[in-house]
Design a protein with these regions (language model features):
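Bacterial Sec-dependent N-terminal signal peptides
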Residues: 1-23
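Active-site mouth of glycoside hydrolases
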Residues: 27-222, 227-237, 362, 374-388, ...
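Short loop/turn segments at secondary-structure transitions that flank enzyme active sites
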Residues: 43-45, 263-265, 359
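Short conserved micro-motifs at the rims of enzyme active sites and ligand-binding pockets
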Residues: 48-49, 267-271, 324-326, 365-366
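Structural motif corresponding to alpha-helix initiation and N-cap regions
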Residues: 73-77, 158, 295-298, 336-339
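Catalytic domains of carbohydrate-active enzymes, especially glycoside hydrolases
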Residues: 74-96, 298-308, 343-345, 349-352
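Active-site region of glycoside hydrolase catalytic domains
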Residues: 151, 155-290, 297-320, 348-354
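Aromatic-rich peripheral "rim/lid" segments of glycoside hydrolase catalytic domains that contact
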Residues: 324-399
Length: 399
């Protein structure tokens, strides 16, 4: 009898140890992301015919078709496979929940919607890809960083994340949760007030508290919190970003800070500059923000947050496609150089990076398309893929 009890005890201990090892810290999670991709303009769409800025919480007519409301086709397993086969091993899935709520008082999620999200997560995990699930374009939350709305919004956010965490809690630690997105005053992307920052901090703490309270795999799940508007400047230099308090025993080990990096915007987002970086100054005007600026900024992230045990997630980044006639090839070569630099420098510091892909193609502002979802996931921005792969290779070299 004693022998049997001892065997049972040893087996229990073995499984407990295995379980502990399976729970990766946030920094381990991020370091294992060679390249991440955003499934943009898909599950964060408003319902067909619904105002994208609406703060209404409910389930309007046609909500089940929100996935295609902004012109992108239905996501299939082939969509995920194409991303995997191109060299990405992580996907961020931005999700709008507010138009899929069956009971606003309880923030209950439509079974059809949550089952669809699970289906896409399952496809990602089948290819052993990491996943970030977030809340994005929740206008009732993101557009009201004010004390007048703080208590009500935190209550709703807690209910929403309780429901998400319970539904997705069975997933292993390849799946991470991100609490909010780009919280900001409407039409104002500039410096926040102390009030705005305080509300963002409250959102972050609410998110961490409620997810941990759901127990199980969520006790040590990788949780990602945000600076105001996901602009790290407002966390690094205002001094008002508060690291949420995790449960006892976790420290900061299972938490990351998220930022979005379209820097400099005049090159990466609006396309006012056609060249970036020291080697390309000979070909035309370049923005003042260059490689040194990027490296110094990344080092600041390490000293401010990485040194405290937090992971760093660049949840969105990208370069709009913009070019001029005969210089198009060289300008695309420059985009490759930017991608290589960012991915290399980020990976050297253990950051994870998730490039934004909105399936928009053309020449101008915010043309962040990489894979053409309307043409069987054909790679149209191969210069972007090239730069990312070069960055991965560069980061593997001894420093």
């Amino acid at each position: 009898m004693k022998t049997k009890l001892r065997i049972c005890w040893l087996l229990t201990l073995m499984f407990a140890v295995m379980s502990c090892h399976a729970q990766k810290t946030a920094r381990q999670w991020n370091s294992e992301v060679t390249a991440g991709w955003n499934l943009g303009n898909q599950f964060e769409c408003s319902a067909p015919g619904q105002d994208g800025e609406s703060m209404d919480i409910g389930e309007p007519d046609g909500a089940d078709n929100a996935e295609t409301a902004w012109g992108n086709p239905v996501v299939t397993k082939k969509t995920i496979k194409a991303v995997h086969d191109a060299g990405f091993n992580a996907i961020r899935i931005p999700i709008r929940w507010q138009c899929h709520i069956t009971n606003p008082a309880a923030m209950s999620i439509s079974k059809t919607w949550i089952d669809r999200i699970k289906e896409v997560i399952d496809w990602c995990l089948e290819y052993d890809m990491k996943v970030i699930v977030n809340v994005q374009h929740e206008k009732w939350l993101e557009s009201r960083p004010f004390y007048a709305n703080k208590e009500e919004n935190c209550r709703k956010l807690a209910l929403l994340w309780m429901n998400i965490a319970n539904e997705l809690g069975k997933y292993d630690d390849r799946v991470a949760f991100a609490g909010t997105n780009e919280v900001h005053v409407p039409n104002n992307w500039g410096k926040p007030t102390a009030e705005n920052l305080d509300v963002q901090n409250a959102y972050n703490q609410t998110f961490v508290d409620i997810v941990r309270a759901t127990g199980g795999n969520n006790v040590k799940r990788h949780l990602i919190v945000q600076t105001y508007v996901c602009n790290a400047d407002f966390g690094l230099y205002n001094g008002d970003f508060v690291i949420p308090k995790d449960i006892e025993g976790n420290g900061n080990d299972y938490m990351s800070v998220e930022l979005h990096f379209y820097n400099p915007w005049e090159y990466a987002g609006s396309g006012e500059y056609y060249y970036w970086g020291e080697p390309y100054k000979q070909y035309g005007k370049t923005p003042q923000s260059d490689e040194t600026t990027m490296v110094n900024f990344f080092d600041k992230l390490v000293s401010e947050w990485g040194s405290k045990g937090l992971g760093i997630v660049i949840g969105e980044w990208g370069i709009t496609d913009h070019y001029k006639g005969s210089e198009a090839d060289r300008m695309h070569e420059n985009v490759s150089y930017y991608c290589k630099t960012l991915v290399s420098e980020a990976r050297k510091r253990g950051f994870s990076t998730f490039i934004w892909d909105n399936n928009r193609f053309g020449n101008g502002s915010e043309m962040f398309g990489i894979f053409d979802r309307n043409k069987n996931m054909a790679i149209k921005a191969d210069w972007v893929i090239k730069g990312i792969k070069e960055g991965i290779a560069e980061s593997a070299k001894p420093m």
